[in-house]
Design a protein with these regions (language model features):
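Catalytic donor-sugar/metal-binding loop of nucleotide-sugar-dependent glycosyltransferases
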Residues: 93-95, 105-125, 129, 147-166
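Nucleotide-sugar-dependent glycosyltransferase catalytic core
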Residues: 123-147, 180
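A recurrent flexible, glycine/aromatic-enriched loop bordering the glycosyltransferase active site
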Residues: 3, 47, 53-83, 87, ...
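Donor nucleotide-sugar recognition loop
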Residues: 89-105, 140
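Conserved donor NDP-sugar-binding/catalytic core segment of glycosyltransferases
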Residues: 18, 22-54, 127
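Short aromatic/hydrophobic "clamp" motif used to bind/position activated sugar donors
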Residues: 10
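Conserved active-site beta-strand element of glycosyltransferases/polysaccharide synthases
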Residues: 39, 48, 79-80, 97-98, ...
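N-proximal low-complexity "stem/linker" segments adjacent to membrane-targeting elements
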Residues: 150-195
C-alpha cells in the first residue's frame, strides 16, 4: 500500500486510465515553482475504451472548500505530499467506492496548500462498469461519499450537519441544524425616550 511509497509525492490514478505524456512533468514543475504545495489536482476528461475519442472535459476551479464539501471535484489526477499521507493515513475501506473522496477531505483538513493545474492531465477511461460511463452501476459509492462528508464534518467539529444526496449523483447537500436561541436586544437610551 501507500506505506511502501518512498517518494516525496504520491500520484493517485486508476489502473485503466491514461495520463498524457506531460502529466507528471507539469506536476513536478508546479512543485518546483511553488515549494509550499502539499497537494495538486488537475483538470480531466473522459476517453473511449479504444483511446480515440476524448469527451466531457472537466475544467475545475481553484481550491474551493464549499464545493469540495459538495462533490469530489478533485477526482483525477491527485498528487499529494507523502508527509500529508503519513499524517492522515491511507485509503479507508470503510468508504468503499468513495475512499478517494474521504482521503481528499482528510488531506484538505491538514493543509490549505492545495494547487490546481488548469490543464487536462488525466484521461478517465469510460467503460460500462465504471462510474465514468454508468454512475448507477455503483450506487454504494455515492452513499459512501455522503458518509465521508459527514465524517469530515465531525472531524472538524461541525456536529449539526446532515448530508444528503441530491438528484445529481455524486453531488451532496449539507443541511445545518441551526438552533433558534432567544435573542435579546438592549438599547442604552436612559432619559432619551424620544430617540426611540
Amino acid at each position: 500500500g501507500l506505506q511502501l511509497a518512498t517518494g516525496e509525492f504520491i500520484a493517485f490514478a486508476d489502473h485503466d486510465d491514461l495520463l498524457p505524456s506531460n502529466a507528471l512533468y507539469e506536476c513536478v514543475r508546479a512543485i518546483n515553482k511553488h515549494p509550499k504545495i502539499r497537494a495538486i489536482y488537475t483538470d480531466e476528461d473522459k476517453i473511449s475504451m479504444d483511446g480515440k475519442k476524448h469527451f466531457q472535459p472537466h475544467f475545475k476551479p481553484d481550491f474551493n472548500r464549499d464545493l469540495l464539501n459538495s462533490t469530489n471535484y478533485f477526482c483525477h489526477l491527485f498528487v499529494v505530499d507523502k508527509r500529508v499521507v503519513d499524517k492522515v493515513g491511507g485509503l479507508n475501506p470503510e468508504y468503499d467506492g468513495a475512499q478517494d473522496y474521504d482521503f481528499v477531505l482528510r488531506c484538505s483538513e491538514v493543509t490549505r496548500n492545495i494547487y490546481h493545474i488548469p490543464k487536462i492531465l488525466y484521461h478517465w477511461r469510460a467503460h460500462m462498469d465504471s462510474t465514468a460511463e454508468n454512475p448507477e452501476s455503483k450506487m454504494y459509492a455515492f452513499e459512501a461519499g455522503a458518509r465521508a462528508i459527514a465524517a469530515h464534518y465531525k472531524r472538524i467539529g461541525i456536529d449539526n450537519a446532515e448530508v444528503t444526496q441530491t438528484e445529481c449523483l455524486g453531488v451532496y447537500r449539507t443541511h445545518y441544524k441551526i438552533e433558534e436561541p432567544l435573542v435579546s436586544i438592549i438599547i442604552p437610551n436612559k432619559d432619551h425616550t424620544d430617540d426611540l
